[in-house]
From Swiss-Prot:
It is found in: Cytoplasm, Nucleoid. Gene3D superfamilies: Nucleoid-associated protein YbaB-like domain. GO terms for molecular function: DNA binding. Homodimer. This is Nucleoid-associated protein Noca_0318. GO terms for cellular component: bacterial nucleoid; cytosol. Keywords: Cytoplasm, DNA-binding. It comes from the Bacteria. Belongs to the YbaB/EbfC family. Binds to DNA and alters its conformation. May be involved in regulation of gene expression, nucleoid organization and DNA protection. NCBIfam families: DNA_YbaB_EbfC.
Length: 124
C-alpha cells in the first residue's frame, strides 16, 4: 500500500504548497486593495452642497464640510436639520464607498466572509 492517501483519488494530484501559495497571493492582493481603498475619498453632499461629508473607501469618516452662512445655530430647528443633513450626506458617501469596495475587491471578496480578520463585510 502507498504512503500517499490521495493516490486512491486519482494519482495524488493535490499540491498543498501550491494551495498555500495561492492563498498568500490572494491575501496580498486583498491587503493591497484595502490600502488603495483607505487612500480613496468620496463625497456625500446634500441640500445643494450645504453639507458635504468625506468618507474613505473603507467607510471611515474623514471630513465634514458645512457651507458658511447656512446655519447660524440660533434656531434649534436649524441644528436638528443640520444633524439630519450630516447623516444623509454620510449615508450617500458610505453607499459610494461600499460600491467602490465591491468593485475593488470583486473576486477577492468571494468566500472571505467569516475568515479571521475579515468579519462580515470584510472589516468595513
Amino acid at each position: 500500500m502507498s504512503q500517499n492517501p490521495f493516490e486512491a483519488l486519482g494519482g495524488g494530484g493535490f499540491d498543498m504548497n501550491a494551495l498555500l501559495q495561492q492563498a498568500q497571493q490572494m491575501q496580498e492582493q486583498l491587503q493591497s486593495a484595502q490600502e488603495r481603498l483607505t487612500e480613496t475619498v468620496v463625497d456625500g453632499t446634500v441640500a445643494g452642497g450645504a453639507v458635504t461629508v468625506k468618507v474613505n473607501g473603507v467607510g471611515e469618516l474623514v471630513g465634514v464640510e458645512i457651507r458658511a452662512g447656512g446655519f447660524d445655530g440660533s434656531d434649534p430647528d436649524d441644528l436638528s436639520d443640520l444633524g439630519d443633513m450630516i447623516i444623509a450626506a454620510y449615508r450617500d458617501a458610505k453607499a459610494q464607498a461600499d460600491a467602490l469596495a465591491g468593485e475593488a475587491l470583486g473576486p477577492l471578496a468571494g468566500g472571505a466572509e467569516g475568515l479571521p480578520g475579515m468579519p462580515g463585510q470584510l472589516g468595513f
